[in-house]
């Protein structure tokens, strides 16, 4: 069940961050419903400090608090800008409720990419991945290079500091080149 999996994830984050934050030479102990750790030397430590924990999801209650407590980055993948904005606001409120500066968190999203030189190119790429152009325009990064740049600027205005782009047709290298040459230099 989802609730139980979320409980397990919460404990996993408590354990891993507890291990990472235990000073060298000290031991870490944890006793929870799903995990018990006794006298762990809490080694090795991660190279990055703080470790880049990414918490993602669209759950309106528990996810924002989990992100506020543990994440370096919050990600809501494959949603529209409005849903992204609403969820980020919940995360900011959760940060404030536990005394964390909401600006200490990075906010990101993930989108499916479908960029083409013209409408026919876009439609061909959407069909190749079994998706509808209109759905991709709503929830993805879809359109001409100019439209993609505008869409990324809208995401940025909504608070996205980082975007993860997903190419579903891994054989279409021209698609990757198009994004790299005509979109990315301008955002």
Question: Which role fits each region the language model picked out?
Answer:
Residues 1-187:
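Active-site-adjacent structural elements that line small-molecule/cofactor binding pockets in enzymes
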């Amino acid at each position: 069940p989802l609730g139980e999996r979320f409980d397990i994830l919460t404990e996993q984050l408590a354990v891993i961050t507890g291990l990472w934050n235990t000073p060298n030479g000290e031991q870490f102990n944890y006793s929870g419903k799903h995990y018990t750790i006794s006298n762990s030397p809490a080694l090795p430590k991660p190279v990055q400090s703080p470790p880049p924990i990414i918490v993602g999801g669209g759950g309106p209650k528990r996810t924002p608090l989990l992100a506020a407590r543990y994440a370096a980055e919050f990600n809501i993948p494959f949603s529209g800008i409005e849903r992204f904005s609403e969820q980020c606001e919940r995360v900011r409120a959760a940060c404030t409720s536990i005394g964390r500066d909401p600006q200490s968190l990075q906010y990101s999203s993930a989108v499916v990419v479908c960029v083409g030189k013209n409408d026919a190119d876009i439609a061909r790429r959407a069909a190749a991945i079994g998706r509808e152009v209109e759905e991709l325009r709503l929830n993805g990064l879809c359109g001409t290079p100019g439209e993609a740049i505008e869409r990324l600027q809208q995401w940025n205005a909504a608070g996205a500091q980082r975007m993860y782009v997903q190419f579903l047709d891994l054989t279409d290298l021209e698609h990757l080149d198009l994004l790299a040459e005509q979109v990315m230099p301008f955002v």
